[in-house]
Amino acid sequence: MAQSPEKPASFIERDLTSGSSTGPVPTLKASRPSAKTRVRNTESPNPQKLPAWRTWIPALIIWALACATHLATFAYSLAEDQRNPLSNENKNHPGLLSYLNIWDAGWYRDIYKEWYPTELPLRADGSVSFNSWAFMPLHSMISGKVADIFGIDHRLAAVGVSLAAGLALAVVLYRLFIGSLNWRDRGFFDTRALVGDESRNRIALWALAVYAFSPASPIFITGYAEALSTLLLAMSVWCVVRGRYILLLPVALLTALSRPLGVPLGAFVGLWWLWCTVSDYLARRTDEPSQPVLSDAWAAFRGRFGQLLGALLVCSFAFVHPLHAALRTGRMDAYLATELGWSFRKVEDGHQYFAQWVHQFNLYFIGSVPAIIMWAGLVLLILSFYWWMSQKFTRTLLHPALWLWTACYAGYLFIFWLPTSSTVRILLPVFPLSLLIAAYLPKSRMYRPLLVLAGLLGSALWMRLLWGGPDVIGPVWLLP
């Protein structure tokens, strides 16, 4: 039975029961809107936007509440550590500010004070010991400038930069989420929330809340670079979605200098160029099938040539920091040796691809699980993830660029990442997943609040176990 005008179906219910996609991934154009949708979208030449107090202002409030909650949890964790310190890292902290700047934040502070070493420290076995080349310079540079300009402690400046970047990130993520939801309904990426879009606006805000209270989200109020790097990454994705490829270049460069995101970002931008070029070619073949195939292929390539040059530049940004390390130390593999040395490996041991997952879990299980079972588990994990990403709900909810970024970053982790206790934090760049998770069960009143509550409990556990907990449990190093 058709829905009554007074109570239309939600956009998610409509997407799950209508519309289709022609392949395992979304096409560049959303499914053609229905006649009813076209009338609704075009009936007013000047559509009325929802007021700010219903869109980006709630996004800021959600983020501020999450930050306040995390700060209170950090204060409680500090009090517990001072009474009963479980970790050598967390003993005798003079106050909360110091507590927010432990672990990797200390390396960023060292970069600000001493810059990078000219010689790599070596262990007895020849592997490179822990050193600051493993960390990108941007966060240290910005927080250092803030500290110098205002004459404040670098630790306070680092936390302040993270808080400011986090608030900006809340607005950018909200815009990306609402734009992705609008794309499915309108056929194009539109970051406006109009009157009549209340359902999509609520889902976008809930998705932001799920992300803001996710297990590793407390890191956004510390001296770590995550808030700044995720902001720059989200802005890079926004530039790609909107086709702002010139603006993308400086933003992508800053992203690559904030965290080791240059490789997956370059892969994403390059594959997006290929996606756009193939789509242009297919559109030409559909519109004018009588034209020569090579002529259409050349026209599609020529039309996207500038985008290709931009993609190649973005790929090159991944080599800026390694090149800096090579020039300063005189050792061409300085950055690679540092990264491998963090897990007590040497360059001559070679970089493991995929296999590091099996080897690391073999260490965790102390060799009690056969390697064939762990390999089967890894293959199952990879196939399950991409099967989930290929489902109709996923393909029709995420804008293709957000879908492609998620797929690229996940692939990067499967290929290169050494799974440690830091994996929860390393998953923060896949922010589109919070939109997917929040959009399930559209009729449930309890689902999304329970998601936020589960994330809050998870963040408290993450903080107590990894930030203020013991350094080691059995063979597992507990690092945030």
Question: Which residues make up each language-model segment?
Answer:
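Membrane-lumen/periplasm interface segments of specific transmembrane helices
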Residues: 66-84, 265-387, 398, 402, ...
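Transmembrane alpha-helix segments characteristic
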Residues: 393-416
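Loop-to-helix entry region of an early transmembrane alpha helix in multi-pass inner-membrane enzymes
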Residues: 127-133, 137, 141, 149-171, ...
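Membrane-interface transmembrane helices that cradle and orient dolichyl/undecaprenyl
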Residues: 193-194, 198, 236-247, 441-442
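Multi-pass, polyprenyl lipid-linked donor-dependent membrane glycosyltransferases
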Residues: 161-164, 179, 206-235, 247, ...
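Transmembrane-helix motifs of polytopic, lipid-linked glycan transferases
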Residues: 144-145, 157-185, 190, 382-390
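Transmembrane-helix signature of polytopic, membrane-embedded enzymes
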Residues: 153-156, 174-213, 231, 247, ...
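Short hydrophobic/aromatic helix or loop-helix immediately within or flanking a transmembrane segment
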Residues: 99-121, 125-151, 350-352
